[in-house]
């Protein structure tokens, strides 16, 4: 896991130094990345609803959807579920869920998904309801049918390797054209919370592939932004739609990364004296919390540093609440009271400044992003018409 992240970091540091091309809006590659976090996915859902509303307002089109504006949408765990909801087509080949439908989905299904199984030795939740509702909502849709490029991560515990589901890699790896509900359950199957997911796929050549998957956070440690950028880079190099991009650099990337919130005390903090008394189980729980928090911080640090170094800091926006308290820190508290609190967290976050050094609020930054996304979409459409 550390090796994979180190490779991605090195890859993007090298990429950032290879070109100083001045990009036009029409040549930009747009990326949306959504973190994992269980029921805390309500927080980025609030942000997505606001952004989609802004896009509809800017383009005077109530049917505008996020998938119309982003070249790559990536997510892990609950972020993978959100990715599927806004990219899976309905019978009219439009996203089956608008951004405003996501929060009601959590309120309706969250309490049933996080319904304690009562098992002492198995996972906390049996996952049956989650798989059932995913099958009902996503049907038989497969990766290749997604309305834009997706990047949803999981981890195969049999091969001990990450599995990344994307459209652009299907020509080389047709076995990855799995059903979206299998992918969504797999990326959400957090160890200790849900059982791992087994399924098979068949290729046109008759080959059978089996998967034994758990939560995508095992592969991406909760924040899929680097993964999403990697997929976007490959897409820009291989997709004819981006043929005008001769040499990709960060001036040609527009990245929106949505977090699911961290504790005001950087998740839970401990003293050396306290930790010295822990056994293996206590350490296991603490390490998971520490790893997720540290990874989210470091990923943001790496990406923001590179964007700033190439004078493209306005092309990257990380939306994250770092002051969660009480029940809002829990990924599996699906009580109505806590979900209402999470909605309030998201709404309050919109009014907060992006950083201590800037008076710009997240709401203002998202409006700016909406304008960029709209302008870029129009420029590309005009170019395609000639």
UniProtKB/Swiss-Prot annotation:
Chain location of the short sequence motif GXGXXG per the record: 36-41
Residues forming the catalytic site: 77, 215
InterPro entries the record matches: Acyl_Trfase/lysoPLipase (IPR016035), PNPLA_dom (IPR002641)
Keyword Hydrolase annotated: yes
Gene3D superfamilies assigned: Cytosolic phospholipase A2 catalytic domain (3.40.1090.10)
Coiled coil regions, renumbered to chain: 321-384
PROSITE patterns reported for this sequence: PNPLA
Compartmental location: Vacuole
Entry domain remark: The nitrogen atoms of the two glycine residues in the GGXR motif define the oxyanion hole, and stabilize the oxyanion that forms during the nucleophilic attack by the catalytic serine during substrate cleavage.
Any further remark recorded for this protein: Patatin have a dual role as a somatic storage protein and as an enzyme involved in host resistance.
Family named by the database record: Belongs to the patatin family.
Protein name: Patatin-2-Kuras 2
């Amino acid at each position: 896991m550390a090796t994979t992240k180190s490779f991605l970091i090195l890859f993007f540091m090298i990429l950032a130094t290879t070109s100083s091309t001045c990009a036009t809006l029409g040549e930009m590659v747009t990326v949306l990345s959504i973190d994992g976090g269980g029921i805390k996915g309500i927080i980025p859902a609030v942000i997505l609803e606001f952004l989609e509303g802004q896009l509809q307002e800017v383009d005077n089109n109530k049917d505008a959807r996020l998938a119309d504006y982003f070249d790559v949408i990536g997510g892990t765990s609950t972020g993978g579920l959100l990715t599927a909801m806004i990219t899976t087509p309905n019978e009219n080949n439009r996203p089956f869920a608008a951004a405003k439908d996501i929060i009601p989905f959590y309120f309706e299904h969250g309490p049933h998904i996080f319904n304690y199984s009562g098992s002492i030795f198995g996972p906390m939740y049996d996952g049956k309801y989650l798989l059932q509702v995913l099958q009902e909502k996503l049907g038989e849709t497969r990766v290749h049918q997604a309305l834009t490029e997706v990047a949803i991560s999981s981890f195969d515990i049999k091969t001990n390797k990450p599995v990344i589901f994307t459209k652009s890699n299907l020509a080389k790896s047709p076995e990855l054209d799995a059903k979206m509900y299998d992918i969504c359950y797999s990326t959400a199957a957090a160890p200790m919370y849900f059982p791992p997911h087994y399924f098979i796929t068949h290729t046109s050549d008759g080959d059978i592939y089996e998967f034994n998957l758990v939560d995508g956070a095992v592969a991406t440690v909760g924040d899929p932004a680097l993964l999403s950028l990697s997929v976007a880079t490959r897409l820009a190099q291989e997709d004819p739609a981006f043929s005008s991009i001769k040499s990709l650099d960060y001036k040609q990337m527009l990245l929106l990364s949505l977090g699911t919130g961290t504790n005001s005390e950087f998740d839970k903090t401990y003293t050396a004296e306290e930790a010295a008394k822990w056994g293996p189980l206590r350490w296991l729980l603490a390490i998971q919390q520490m790893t997720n928090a540290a990874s989210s911080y470091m990923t943001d640090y790496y990406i923001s540093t590179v964007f700033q170094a190439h004078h493209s800091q306005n092309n990257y926006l990380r939306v994250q609440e770092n002051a969660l308290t009480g029940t809002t820190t829990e990924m599996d508290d699906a009580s109505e009271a806590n979900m209402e609190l999470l909605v309030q967290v998201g709404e309050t976050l919109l009014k907060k400044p992006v950083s201590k050094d800037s008076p710009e609020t997240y709401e203002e930054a998202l409006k700016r992003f909406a304008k960029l996304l709209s302008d870029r979409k129009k420029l590309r459409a005009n170019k395609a018409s000639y």
